[in-house]
A protein has these predicted regions:
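Bacterial N-terminal signal peptides that target proteins for export
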Residues: 1-8
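N-terminal secretory-pathway/extracellular module detecting exported/lumenal segments
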Residues: 19-134
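Bacterial N-terminal signal peptides
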Residues: 9-16
């Protein structure tokens, strides 16, 4: 059993650090904050889709974070979304200490027309190609 724990702990830790090594794609800039998403994390199951997004804040937030990664789930038929997990970091691009750790799904909410969430939903639900905003 001791031999198994030597490789099991590093394996588990590497699974949880995967989001930090994501291939982020630029989506746009909103009020000084940069929004990115990771195409490689897109998973579609029936009419639901999940994907990771990352926000790099232009200034430190009230929670003392400079970046926040969110795992989104979309109900493509009902035009709703929720966060499956939210993590906040003291540095941009998920660097530094993780100050926010919330692996609990939120309640479903409506996707607002013209929002960043809607842009990601359009890609995740294959409604049309995702175009970066200028």
């Amino acid at each position: 059993m001791c031999g198994m724990s030597r490789w099991l702990v590093p394996l588990i830790l590497s699974l949880f650090s995967g989001a930090a090594h994501a291939a982020w794609t630029y989506l746009g800039n909103l009020d000084g904050d940069t929004v990115l998403y990771d195409k490689s994390t897109l998973v579609q199951k029936k009419r639901n889709a999940t994907i990771w997004m990352l926000t790099n804040f232009g200034n430190v937030t009230a929670q003392d974070v400079l970046s926040m990664s969110k795992w989104l789930e979309f109900d493509c038929d009902k035009n709703k979304f929720r966060y499956l997990a939210v993590y906040g970091y003291e540095g941009q691009m998920q660097t530094g200490a993780r100050l926010i750790f919330n692996p609990n799904p939120t309640e479903w909410g409506p996707v607002q027309t013209g929002s960043v969430i809607q842009s990601i939903q359009n890609f995740a639900c294959l409604r049309y190609p995702l175009l970066p905003k200028k």
